[in-house]
Amino acid sequence: MEAERLNSLESLLADLTTRATELRRYLDFDVKSEKLDQVNGELEDPDVWNDQKRAQDLGKEKKSLEAIVHTLIKIDSELNDARDLFEMAREEKDEDTIVAIENDAQELLKLVEGMEFRRMFSNPMDANNCFIDIQAGAGGTEAQDWASMLLRQYLRYCERKGFKVEILEQSDGEVAGIKTATLKVEGDYAYGFLRTETGVHRLVRKSPFDSANGRHTSFSSLFVYPEVDDSIEIDINPADVRIDTYRASGAGGQHINKTDSAVRLTHGPSGIVVQCQNDRSQHRNKAEAWDMLKAKLFELEMRNRMSEQQKLEDSKTDVGWGHQIRSYVLDQSRIKDLRTNFETGNTKAVLDGDLDDFIAASLKQGV
């Protein structure tokens, strides 16, 4: 076995050990480990299930803590094993074991990089679930088809990340595609991963709806906002909200359109409109719609507080709702983020939900 290869593997293991130690420090391993024990203790108390909301919140907290604590324990354990095996394999010149350690080290590197990525989540709401609003721009069928492509893209992305995702509301286009859709995404750091996707997405392609096969440009907008938990008080005057019910239709509504189960809330002072038609129960749709309204009002307040600062920081104004963030030029096989300048030629993979590199670039650059 060549010395250079062994030295390289030894250096990688040493580097991973240093980074794992740093991870424990800035992810507050000791604090989170103690908190996990506390949460597990509460969940073992049979009386906790008398309060379903409290039990569910504890279950979510446990899952979030385990994602950090158990992963850090796994990294440390496997690193210790790899270092011990490496010393023995080097002495015995055991090629097969060295190859196995090299493979294990690459897997450990992915784990460490994944945990390091959490440092990018600087927004206090990053750990929350979130909602995604998709809206077709002007341009009729072409824009509505583009909106449906984005809907599919983000559904696939959420599946790849292991997030639970559901379509709360969808308004279909007259010929093809969708006019609007709202998704609810549940998972660890769902908002943190998706928040930089807010903005206008531009598509350039030869249109399948044009008999002359002409080149068309379409726009669709995304708005991502965090779910707000009960610890944050959002004061909504019921008198300011108009409640309409209607029969659900389209995806999510095929089996629930015999009664007026869909719910639309209109908040007068802000002009915000939310709607939910995902469930057969009008009561559950109404509860989900109120959660959406609460989340949108919270996000509106946060944006208002930041508006003066954003005016002063011209370099950051392109992250707003009304600005292009990404360009998809399909006939040139090029997708480019206009904020980070990251681009790729693998358009099929991106449209199939492979957004990790775009999101990583945005978070690293503080978009």
Swiss-Prot record:
Methylated by PrmC. Methylation increases the termination efficiency of RF2. GO terms for cellular component: cytoplasm. InterPro entries: PCRF (IPR005139), Pep_chain_release_fac_I (IPR000352), Pep_chain_release_fac_I_sf (IPR045853), PrfB (IPR004374). It is found in: Cytoplasm. The modification N5-methylglutamine is found at Q254. The keyword Protein biosynthesis applies. Pfam families: PCRF (PF03462), RF-1 (PF00472). One of its GO terms (molecular function) is translation release factor activity, codon specific. This is Peptide chain release factor 2. The keyword Endoplasmic reticulum does not apply. Keywords: Cytoplasm, Methylation, Protein biosynthesis. PROSITE patterns: RF_PROK_I (PS00745). Peptide chain release factor 2 directs the termination of translation in response to the peptide chain termination codons UGA and UAA.
